[in-house]
Amino acid sequence: MTLEEKKEQVKNFRPIDDTFFEVLADDIGVCQEMLRIILEDEKLIVKDVIVQSSERNLYGRSVRLDALCILGNGKKCNVEVQRSNKDHHLKRVRFNASVITVRDSQTDDKFEETIDLIVVYISEFDIFKRSRVIYHVDSVIRETQEKVDDGLERVFVNTAVKDGTTISEYMDCFLQKEIDNAKFPKLTNRVHYLKHEEGGVNEMCEVMEQYSKKAYQQGEEAGKEIG
């Protein structure tokens, strides 16, 4: 397959598409820029990123890791993109957070040593239908409305609501096939690299091939079970 044929394969991908996002997010600079915007913390540091297809992914298929970021303050942040609205999203977030927490814990750990985890759930629709681009879901004491810190932060952000904020502008980029926005240089440059430069196009095609092989294998296994 020529470079031009490969470019043709990846040209229609957008950041909201999970396969493209996974490759896009396999870059510390992109994730740091994204989380600084979504979590509104200009000093936030991303030290490492693990994606689903990475050999360093020790979580297996039990949890979806579009991008698991290890932050400078020791917290972990699992970022997931979701286009389909045919799921129970809150339970999905709860399940994935639980798997990550258990996987990163030892049986003799004290509970105070349980990891602090942030979940950022990016969707193509407004989950709560309250016309907000971002929602922070907290645990609270019902009787007093006081927030309880149990080490889990849940942030839901979407591409559907346009409210003129920087977060909304950034989220709108997730719907574009091509991005050229000086406010978001890391995202802009990474998308260009993956779509127009040989190294990036090859990287994208390799991941696509991996998923194609997995889908074929799963289909064969399912066929054997039926047979």
Walk through the language-model features, giving the residues of each.
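Accessory alpha/beta interaction modules
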Residues: 1-153, 163-165, 218
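Short, charged alpha-helical interaction segments and adjacent helix-coil junctions
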Residues: 1-11, 15, 19, 77-82, ...
